[in-house]
Amino acid sequence: MKFLVDVHAHTIASTHAYSTVHDYLAVAKEKGIKLFAITDHGPDMADAPHFWHFVNMRVLPRIVDGIGVLRGIEANIKNENGDIDFFGSYLNELDIVLAGFHEPVFQPSTQTTHTQALVNCIESGNVDIISHPGNPAYPIDIKRVAEVAATHNVALEINNSSFLTSRKGSLKNCTAIARAVKEAGGYLVLGSDSHVAFSLGGFDKAIELIQEVDFPIERILNHSPKALLEFLTSRGHKGMDEYAEIV
């Protein structure tokens, strides 16, 4: 099983990451990756890029040397209301919006608080994908979140980095999330959460998990460029036709 689309990658604009857009393009070419998203951390993170970084992503070509580049963000969920740190008409200019919990912005609290924050964030309509929802530092009502996400056409991420260097102890939660999303009829997406270009498209542990739960591949959004682009179009994102040559 091979996935040639990655929705979650950070550049040196997030200064705890170590690669440029050019670095990612080189690795994508080497690995045969067809489409990937640049999703630097939202501006409320201490070392995140300025708000204008995201506004100016319009200068990025959507296709470079046959590789699609999505203009995105991994926004920070700020509070129980589900607010994120990027807003207004600027959201509509991005191709893909991830959002998740990060300790410097939203300190871990109770399961009830975390669950309500995710539900409100999903229901806001501002977010396409919830990033690393299996983080054990932020326990949630998995069944409820999966059902709300399915109802509102929002995907939950199985984050490969959570099984390697970050968010230790995520496997049990992520397995439960995959089972709950399968039951609810919703979507998953696999993300490398790459902070260095070498790990772009690295999904080995996430693939093991989805195989274990027998998750239907047609409901894993990055199983093909077409599937992800059709999902983003259904979410109201414009410009997806510009990627026609890679579909």
Curated annotation (Swiss-Prot):
Q: What is this protein called?
A: Probable phosphatase Shew_1420
Q: Report the EC number(s), separated by commas if there are several.
A: 3.1.3.-
CDD domains listed in its UniProt record: PHP_HisPPase_Ycdx_like (cd07437)
Which keywords label this protein? Hydrolase, Metal-binding, Zinc
Q: Which InterPro entries match?
A: Phosphatase_YcdX_put, PHP_dom, PHP_phosphatase, Pol/His_phosphatase_N, Pol/histidinol_Pase-like
Per the similarity annotation, which family is this?
Answer: Belongs to the PHP family.
List ligand-binding residues for Zn(2+) 2. 16, 41, 195
The terms under GO molecular function for this entry are: phosphatase activity; zinc ion binding
Class of enzymatic activity (EC top level):
hydrolase
Enumerate the NCBIfam families for this protein.
PRK09248.1
Q: Which organism is it from?
A: Shewanella loihica (strain ATCC BAA-1088 / PV-4)
Binding-site residues for Zn(2+) 1, renumbered to this chain: 8, 10, 74, 193
What is the cofactor note? Answer: Binds 3 Zn(2+) ions per subunit.
Q: Name one GO biological process term.
A: bacterial-type flagellum-dependent swarming motility
Q: Which cofactor does it need?
A: Zn(2+)
Question: What are the record's GO terms for cellular component?
Answer: cytosol
Tell me the superkingdom of the source.
Bacteria
- Which residues of this UniProt protein bind Zn(2+) 3? 74, 102, 132
Note one Pfam family from the annotation: PHP
